[in-house]
Amino acid sequence: MRWSRYFLYTTKEEPSETEAASHRFLTKAGFIKQVASGIYELTPIAFRVLKKIENIVRDEMDKAGAQELLLTILNPAELWKETGRWDYYGNELFKLKDRSDRDYCLGPTHEEEITDLVRKTVRSYKQLPLNLYQIHTKFRDEKRPRYGLIRGREFIMKDAYSFDTDEESAKNSYDIMVKAYKNIFKRLNLNILMVKADVGQIGGKSSHEFVAITKYGEALIAYCENCGYAANTEIVELKKPNVEKEPPLVLEEVYTPNIKTIEELSSFLNVAKSKIIKSVLYIKEDKPIMVLIRGDKKIDEKKLERLFGTDEFRLAEDDEVLRLLNTEKGFIGPFVEGKDIEIIVDNSLYNASNMVVAFNKPHYHYKNANIDFENFVDVAQVEENDPCPECGSPLKVAQGLELGHTFLLGTRYSLPMKAFFTDKDGVEKPVVMGCYGIGISRLIAALVEQYHDEKGIKWPLPVAPFQVLISCVNTSDDIQYSTSEHLYKSLTQEGIEVLFDDRDVSPGVKFNDADLIGIPYRIVVGKKAKDGLVEVVDRHTLKAVDVPIDKVLDYIKDILNVNGR
């Protein structure tokens, strides 16, 4: 492909509101164009990357025994109402009506539709196991789209669905898909952690995420370098501390004027934050719930969501605190006798002794309080150096970008949708399902996040839009241009993917653009061409080697073969 004819336009200007490196470089390099918030077009060069990613994913899915199909984008509401997700999925679900006033949604995921297809066709155990997948566009009305392709409202995804006769067979299908996912990420040269995850809106029995470490990811993960444990922080169980109760001290009522935060209280009373009970009042479906936690800990509202079984809860407003407890925020305490307020106590307060606690009296706290709590749950945010639940070693905590997600669904969809089969004894049973997603367009961003420097992208060879870039330094120089033409034809005839920069622009522009778009190998045809030499530059190592013109073809073929063409 000749750059002068290629639909590729880079820009020198720094794009606005591009925090993530992938968003910045993909925009500057002309790979993506924003249409609206969270909605992007892929230009031809990005489309080449996309297709290479798809082909790797497709190859591993096919090897795993999955069969490709294509489902619809427009889903009738009736299917989603069968599983209860029409309402449960929330505002992220794009809903619309047709001219006959029938309800539809733009599919964010396809458990309902694939289950409907299978229940219409699968009747016998002889038709199972079955694994079906598609690569298709999805839609989610993200509240806050950001970081370019990392978090959009329209995106391309591979979703697969397995159907089995029983739990054992379903687990086997799940393990096969997990292996396929590991192969995919290895072939993409992505550094990935497989972590235990919450089942979320998809539902089911268990799940895992495949996460790339980056500060622009929405997932917060905890991992142990000692035993290999890794999980989303929201499902890491922080156990009760191994502490003994202290001998009780005399309870004191202390004046704490306008002291409303844990930090202020700790400083004012000269006590550790771990010796303070923090009381937080939530409202869930008009019902007040008080959550107690140690002062040095934070509440993980994702854990609360799992505990409550809904995300429909919020912090109490000032007027609600006044009405329910006759106090103000900062002085809320767990003394609610005669009030219809549920109390939830975090594990961190197990055997807590001689604590500082508010008691619903403005500007006062108790010191040396000893409260006998009976029931404890884990609702604390995981923090760096918290003990690993498997081996007790200190945990590491990092942000991560979810690239793949696998779910062992069980009968979450087959039961309500009556997707039944008849077993060998003639007994009708629900199929046991799994589902498996990979964010295809998000992978483009993830690759750039892991492969870039200050100048631009450094594509791994398996997904690079082109394998080789030929930069003709001076297109007006007959020797340089004819040499570039010769190399372009020689390489393309060998099936090597080449972008020939034949533009009539300055060498500086060509070199800057070459670094920006990140093609793995660059052949620089400059002044040395008259001496029979060109320069071959490795974009990853920046190593430059002079190669005789008549040896370039063999040299390129050798490095492509060595590096996994």
From Swiss-Prot:
Cellular localisation: Cytoplasm
Pfam families on file: HGTP_anticodon (PF03129), tRNA-synt_2b (PF00587), tRNA_edit (PF04073)
Lineage: Bacteria, Pseudomonadati, Aquificota, Aquificia, Aquificales
GO BP terms in the entry: prolyl-tRNA aminoacylation
EC number: 6.1.1.15
Enzyme class: ligase
Matching Gene3D superfamilies: Anticodon-binding domain (3.40.50.800), Bira Bifunctional Protein, Domain 2 (3.30.930.10)
UniProt xrefs under InterPro entries: aa-tRNA-synt_IIb (IPR002314), aa-tRNA-synth_II (IPR006195), aa-tRNA-synth_II/BPL/LPL (IPR045864), Anticodon-bd (IPR004154), Anticodon-bd_dom_sf (IPR036621), Pro-tRNA-ligase_IIa (IPR002316), Pro-tRNA-synth_IIa_bac-type (IPR004500), Pro-tRNA-Synthase_IIa_type1 (IPR023717)
UniProt family annotation: Belongs to the class-II aminoacyl-tRNA synthetase family. ProS type 1 subfamily.
Protein name as catalogued: Proline--tRNA ligase
Function: Catalyzes the attachment of proline to tRNA(Pro) in a two-step reaction: proline is first activated by ATP to form Pro-AMP and then transferred to the acceptor end of tRNA(Pro). As ProRS can inadvertently accommodate and process non-cognate amino acids such as alanine and cysteine, to avoid such errors it has two additional distinct editing activities against alanine. One activity is designated as 'pretransfer' editing and involves the tRNA(Pro)-independent hydrolysis of activated Ala-AMP.
One of the record's GO molecular function terms: aminoacyl-tRNA deacylase activity
Signal peptide bounds: none
GO CC annotations, alphabetized: cytosol
Subunit record text: Homodimer.
Keyword Protein biosynthesis found: yes
Catalytic activity: tRNA(Pro) + L-proline + ATP = L-prolyl-tRNA(Pro) + AMP + diphosphate
The organism of origin for this protein: Hydrogenobaculum sp. (strain Y04AAS1)
SUPFAM superfamilies linked to this entry: Class II aaRS ABD-related (SSF52954), Class II aaRS and biotin synthetases (SSF55681), YbaK/ProRS associated domain (SSF55826)
